[in-house]
Amino acid sequence: LLSINCGELVFKTSDSELEVFLSKQIGRDDAVSFAVDKDNKNESELILKRGSFNMNLRQGEYSLLVTDKKGRNITIPILINAGETSEIDFEFPTHIPDNCIYIHKGYYYSNISHHAAHGRHSYTDSYFLLDRELTIGEYLEFFKTVKEEKLRQLYNPDLLFHIDGKFQLRKLFGDDYKILPPYNENMPVVGISVEGANAFCRYMSEKIGMKCRLPYFVELEKAARGTGRRLYVWGNRFKSDYALLAGNAAVKEYPNGAPPKTFPHDYSLFGAYDLTGNVRELVQLNRNLDYYVLYGG
């Protein structure tokens, strides 16, 4: 039987050697991140389990750190509601692409805002996501493979440059692939077209041998929000210095975007950076509609 303030966690896996560290999420508005720190037990009150298990927990937000025998880690945020059972059916993916996080299938609360605190229960399948924004240098590697001039014009990002006291629309890459200043290869790429973004995904699909695409809106929202009802990746209180936003004095230092992972507080429960600030992300609205929206930033 569950007490009035408790719910049940059921974790199922066929791998009895998996180590699962369970931690209550603490300091939800002030911690740098909410990832489980198994080397700092004083802050996390860790519970270690192996393989499948079930247990009763007080209602609240928790994190699971799942570690396989290769030493790979996956973080799974969970929300325990009083009187309810949260079931996780988990198998470790055989391969995790470089610089990617794995986001486990399941429900999360979408469309949370100051005016809609409860949100809607939305579901996603499991997926991989780049753990930070794509850089200009990475996009340039793809762009150098494009030979047709018409496509080169379409895929070359259009950006506004302040030249001789006027704003002028220019291409990011020159004829010799030179990146026009003030941009550089370490900054997040901006100004790309939908066609350019999808062409880059096709290029990456061939490069890594896995299908790549732009994320759906719900996938990026889940990666940012976790499974609870937080307003921001770090919690519910807005803090302008936690991310590169208009109210942050760091905008003077990074007027055109900062290198990914510059702001450690802008780090989600799943392990993705810059989903609140820095540049915006281009996402598909959903799998059934050929519409695209800009998210975050």
What kind of region is each of these model predictions?
Residues 1-3:
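Long, contiguous interaction/targeting segments characteristic
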Residues 21-48:
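Short amphipathic beta-strand segments in non-cytosolic proteins
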Residues 17, 107-110, 114-115, 135, ...:
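Active-site/binding-pocket entry motifs
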Residues 20-22, 64-65:
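Beta-strand-rich binding/interaction modules
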Residues 27, 45-69, 73, 77, ...:
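A short glycine-rich, aromatic-capped structural motif
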Residues 175-297:
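Functional-site microenvironments in short loops/helix caps that host divalent-cation chemistry
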Residues 8, 17-19, 61:
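Exposed beta-strand and adjacent loop surfaces of beta-rich binding modules
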Residues 7-14, 24:
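A short, amphipathic beta-strand motif
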